[in-house]
Regions:
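Helix-to-loop junction immediately C-terminal to a conserved catalytic motif
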Residues: 48
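Conserved ABC transporter NBD signature motif
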Residues: 53-63
């Protein structure tokens, strides 16, 4: 389980996140939503152990702050919003970075085929020999997802769940590949891992998230199921838009129809 209690994060003298609680069980996709500047990325980086924080965060019963980088890398992989590569790496070389996990020397034999399998999962078969910088933004995003999948390919390790932390994983993708990536996340969770993802598309969030955490001005505005959190009044207040939340009879999942900005 990922558990956070009273988490606060400051950058310099500015408080970015204040008093946020969160619990995510293995088998779940948890979505963090909120307007730009609400503290989502900062909170995700604290959860994954990439930023210092106040309060408590634990992963699989261990305090994140006490974990060595190699320990954390064995059980969680992080997809950032953007990954700038300055060197002329091929796609295969970028994906293989996910296999390092703090290791040095030769990679274990059982990992040799993982880069190609990961590229196939994100529908980039045959791209391994191409240069990363030559790809479109959406293709680069899928390469980075293949990299993090290599890092935690098996959703369970030594009887413990592994975790994907995804910061806007579908922001550069067309609708087909958005669904492809979210299906990969759902499959990872169903096989015993867990996913924490920052998403902006509220309808995609409703389709895939088991639990939603709504952030507003650095604090948690709401937490719960899609039906509990995607409400007209809450979403209008947090995002400052006029909208209508409906529920089709077929699956009962809420859908969000924006109408206009709040004047």
């Amino acid at each position: 389980m990922i558990e956070a209690s009273g988490v606060a994060v400051s950058i310099g003298r500015k408080r970015i996140v204040s008093g946020v609680d969160l619990k995510v069980q293995p088998g779940e996709i948890a979505a963090i939503v909120g307007p730009n500047g609400s503290g989502k990325t900062t909170f995700l980086r604290a959860l994954s152990g990439d930023l210092p924080y106040e309060g408590s965060i634990s992963m699989n019963g261990r305090a994140v702050a006490s974990m060595r980088p190699s320990e954390a890398a064995a059980f969680r992989a992080v997809l950032p919003q953007a990954a700038i590569m300055s060197f002329p790496f091929t796609v295969r070389e970028v994906v293989k970075l996910g296999l390092l996990n703090g290791r040095s020397g030769a990679l274990p034999e059982e990992t040799q085929g993982l880069p190609e399998r990961a590229l196939a999962r994100v529908e980039l078969e045959g791209f391994g020999g191409r240069f990363y910088q030559e790809l479109s933004g959406g293709e680069q995003q899928r390469v980075q997802l293949a990299r993090v999948l290599c890092q935690v390919w098996a959703p369970v390790l030594d009887g413990k769940p592994r975790w994907l932390f995804l910061d806007e994983p579908v922001s550069s993708l067309d609708i087909r590949h958005q669904l492809t990536i979210m299906n990969i996340a759902r499959d990872f969770a169903r096989r015993g891992g867990g996913v924490v993802a920052i998403l902006h598309d509220l309808n995609l969030t409703a389709m895939y998230a088991d639990r939603i955490f709504v952030m507003h001005r650095g604090k948690l505005a709401a937490a719960g199921s899609p039906g509990e959190t995607l409400r007209d009044d809450l979403i209008a207040r947090v995002f400052e838009v006029r909208l209508k939340v409906g529920q089709p009879p077929r699956d009962g999942l809420p859908f969000v129809l924006p109408q206009s900005a709040v004047e």
